[in-house]
């Protein structure tokens, strides 16, 4: 079978037609498992988290190509229009994963040494269950490329970390007519949020830009429904993005101290803090064979120098790179400003070019590693 442009476009289209928000990747896992078994992958397996792996070649060096199957919720009708392929995950990040699969299949006949492992992981948009299981699988690799929308001319080498916080404020309740006597939990919750926002802006805003700043986002606020009573509970859900200078432990100390001071200022107020997810910030080295190979491949395919990016989001590279400490980078087609929107699409020409770039880069990594 020839893994040409038609195959690659059709593969991505089928992947987009299988709706796979975090926690519901089973159908896409099954599809890719069967696809891998029917193509040139020599070894195919699925782990207990639902990650799917395909292996080509053997021995060392070993290159991991890792992309995620899950998306944020929200179905988008799949269609091709004006050279664009629309669908949920077209940018983030099924195009990257499909391009990696196509690149690996097209490299199989050109490999003399080494191996490629393509990993299709679950829950990247959630709590990272997939990449954590991949680490537990004890896969032995020397280099890794992660598939996320950097844009065709760019390579991502750094991501911020994050803390997902759930903070609850509890007060005494009473008749709404006594609002002048009783504290309102919703108002207290919002006061606390403003203190968190202000301390980040005043003490942890970097002159070097948002990547180096501690940045909070209020992503949810809720309260108990009351009838004629003062609200006595308010819950804040906060996404705190961490620069490389502030790890999770330091960020927790900052927020914990602020909450303790807030408690002292508000007698009778109970404040509880819970961390629902944490990922450390990560900065990969820029002088590795992986970054060099991607830069050369981009220049050879499109005739322009690659730009190295620091991103304010968080990716599976954070968790993997922190654990394995091997050369890594993130690369993939797509305009990341379209991620998680209802106008998500991939430029088909860019997608096809990214396959060539992945292929060139992996070939360079394998050849260079074999020479050393």
Language model region names:
Residues 1-64, 72, 233-237, 251-254, ...:
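N-terminal helical capping/dimerization or prosegment-like subdomains
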Residues 3, 21, 150, 157, ...:
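Metal-dependent amide/peptide-bond hydrolase catalytic core
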Residues 32, 97-107, 134, 189-192, ...:
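Buried hydrophobic packing segments
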Residues 45-46, 85-93, 308-312:
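Active-site nucleophile and cofactor-binding loops and adjacent substrate-binding regions
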Residues 48-49, 67-69, 122, 147-150, ...:
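Fold-independent oxyanion-binding glycine-rich loops
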Residues 60-120, 348:
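Active-site metal-coordination/substrate-binding segment of hydrolases
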Residues 63-65, 119, 143-145, 327-329:
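Hydrophobic/aromatic beta-strand patches that form the interior of the parallel beta-sheet core
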Residues 98-164, 370:
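Acidic/histidine-rich catalytic neighborhood of metal-dependent amide-processing enzymes
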